[in-house]
């Protein structure tokens, strides 16, 4: 059934829809299956996303038609479909009238992902008007709270030097805590890796107690505040709360030094909202493990990493992993800096829409995946600032002189970039950074040709066979 006469209105202007403030706008890259027309398929897509089905039903009235989602722009050559969803379509809490990401996804990314006439459809951007945006929690705290704990300025406080304890699984409580202590002697921030929780060989209660003690010892030894991000992910909201309460109680006087990590993609929006609302005074660390199943450029269904991170800010994440923008080991490219801008700025341009956040707190980019001291200056130059949390596992524990030197090398790389000093020049005066070149010679050869001569390091590579 061709539903284009009802669910398509190409006379609508995007600027008028935005000015009206009554529609959520979504941009999809969509392709119909062979034998289906583009506009007719887009209309069916909008119908399935809102008030329609595959046949006309007798219960439809004029009010129902008034809240139809409408296709307002198509560009078949670019496979672009834009749809306007009336704000009234989206579900609200009965307890407080707030909006929910679950409803947003159910409409904009629900049944339309399995339609028989659609080859693929992926959301690349969305726009929320102020009236709807204001119904989301947004972040309660962000990196400024961590800077305050660290004794830094709460604006432009710079890089938080962090790591992930490796191996990600297999360490028992005592060696895990000792690894934390070792890194904290040179760095700021440690996070649980996403699978670490309450394994039989590493009970959470035992591990957290030892980590809290390791933090106290490191702070006493260095005279500096330290930070820890504890994984409280669970299926059951009551388990999330129980874990969070135990962690904060155990850290005691250092509770403000603790972030609470939730695997937001695998555990879902309810887990993020539970943590955001139950623990509003603590940094909510949104880990996105699993997101690549839908966000990868190789996937033509789902939504992009940009959309995922934008939703995280609405939900209230204090920070979310954003990848390394092509400078680390994970999938990404330099243009991904637009994700960081959308998370941190009060108004930012996306792939299709310019979004105003109306004063909603910023969400902090968290950088991880193959980063080390040698890769960082290029990353900062691409982004234009260093107001991020870095969690470098191999970049710290893979340093030739150990994790303390690894942490210091990361900090020195940031300081070199901040001060506008070429990395090799800075390394001549800072041994940990200099030794990072020997720790990661493959990266050094690629990024800094001639580094051995500059640093006076003997070239021990075997000559290639003739």
Curated annotation (Swiss-Prot):
Binds 1 Mg(2+) ion per subunit. Disulfide bonds: none annotated. The record marks 329 as: Transition state stabilizer. GO terms for biological process: reductive pentose-phosphate cycle. The keyword Magnesium applies. Substrate binds at residues 111, 168, 288, 321, 368. PROSITE patterns: RUBISCO_LARGE. It catalyses: 2 (2R)-3-phosphoglycerate + 2 H(+) = D-ribulose 1,5-bisphosphate + CO2 + H2O; D-ribulose 1,5-bisphosphate + O2 = 2-phosphoglycolate + (2R)-3-phosphoglycerate + 2 H(+). Its EC number is 4.1.1.39. The modification N6-carboxylysine is found at residue 191. The basic functional RuBisCO is composed of a large chain homodimer in a 'head-to-tail' conformation. In contrast to form I RuBisCO, the form II RuBisCO are composed solely of large subunits. Homodimer. This is Ribulose bisphosphate carboxylase. It comes from Rhodospirillum rubrum (strain ATCC 11170 / ATH 1.1.1 / DSM 467 / LMG 4362 / NCIMB 8255 / S1). The gene is cbbM.
